[in-house]
Regions:
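Structural signature of tandem-repeat unit edges
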Residues: 1-18, 28-42, 52-65, 75-88, ...
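A short, structured beta-strand/loop element
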Residues: 20-22
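Consensus positions within tandem repeat domains that build extended binding/scaffold surfaces
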Residues: 24, 45-47, 67-70, 91-93, ...
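Short secondary-structure boundary/capping segments
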Residues: 25-26, 253-254
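Short polybasic/polar patches that bind polyanions
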Residues: 72, 189, 275
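A structural signal for leucine-rich repeat
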Residues: 118, 130, 143, 211, ...
Length: 284
């Protein structure tokens, strides 16, 4: 599967005879159910964008790519059933669907585009099927999905992008896969976590990754983490302890509030950091 950034390839496929276009979609503009005929395997950019009448989509059994903003600002009420042929959902494909409540991605999905479900304010459940090919949750993917409360991540996930779950305030508990290596800038900004267990292999927590997660009480930093970004746990008002047994290569400023105690080894780089930042510490 070629990259979602391969614009040249997609510009050619958009004119393929197997591509369902916005012109074809306009013939269904007054229908509540949009059914993509079987002969079409690509859905063009902006195909149904802004069509508030359509409540349900039936994809063709061989569908492979869903284009940019293809179903943006529709009001889908029924979950979209993705066939096991779907490889890519492009940027903003389902953004601003305020009635969509759940989504299950097929194991075949490799690429999920930036902003693809941004602003889906009724979305409660997101799940990736077992053995999912998806390795990355992209930038702003579920940004402002304010009712999102359950996420089942891909088994082989490597990274969570910038603001992927920004302001998902009902997201109180997640299980991150062991394969995860990086959590991006403000990825879980103002989420509702009460606990968080970071996987052992994780290497980077970018700036403000968990900023404002006010109900967090205690976090252990695994020893493979080499980068702790600025204000990574700042604004976590209930956070009592941040435990760091090793010395990351980079520790940004203000990683926690002043009322939080950092548990670390005496004489360590983290110990010196606490002294410089005026943070409380407790030796382990």
């Amino acid at each position: 599967m070629r990259s979602q950034n391969d614009k040249a390839t997609w510009s050619i496929l958009r004119f393929d005879h197997r591509t369902f276009t916005a012109q074809l979609a306009s013939m269904q503009k007054n229908k509540q159910i949009a059914a993509i005929p079987e002969k079409y395997i690509y859905i063009d950019d902006c195909c149904y964008k802004g069509n508030g009448k359509i409540k349900e989509i039936i994809l063709s059994s061989g569908c492979r790519i869903i284009g940019k903003e293809a179903f943006a600002s529709c009001q889908l009420r029924k979950p979209v059933v993705f066939p096991q042929t779907v490889k890519e959902i492009k940027e903003s494909a389902f953004s601003e669907n305020h009635s969509l409540r759940e989504v299950t991605f097929p194991a075949s999905l490799e690429i999920l585009g930036d902003y693809s479900y941004k602003g889906c304010t009724a979305l409660k459940t997101v799940a990736f099927e077992t053995s999912s090919e998806c390795r990355r949750i992209p930038e702003c993917c579920f940004h402002s999905c304010t009712q999102l409360s359950k996420v089942v991540f891909p088994e082989h996930l490597k990274s969570i992008g910038r603001r992927a779950f920004y302001r998902c305030k009902e997201l109180k508990e997640i299980t991150l896969p062991d394969t995860l290596e990086e959590i991006g800038l403000e990825a879980f900004y103002f989420c509702g976590f009460e606990t968080i267990v970071l996987p052992k292999e994780i290497k980077k927590l970018d700036q403000r990754a968990f900023f404002g997660c006010k109900k967090l009480k205690e976090v252990y930093i695994p020893e493979n983490i080499m980068y702790l970004g600025e204000e990574v746990f700042h604004g976590c008002n209930w956070l009592e302890y941040l435990e760091i047994h090793h010395d990351p290569e980079h520790i940004g400023s203000k990683i926690v509030n002043k009322n939080c105690t950092i548990r670390c080894k005496k004489g360590s780089k983290v110990d010196l950091y606490c002294e410089e930042q005026g943070l409380k510490r407790e030796y382990i």
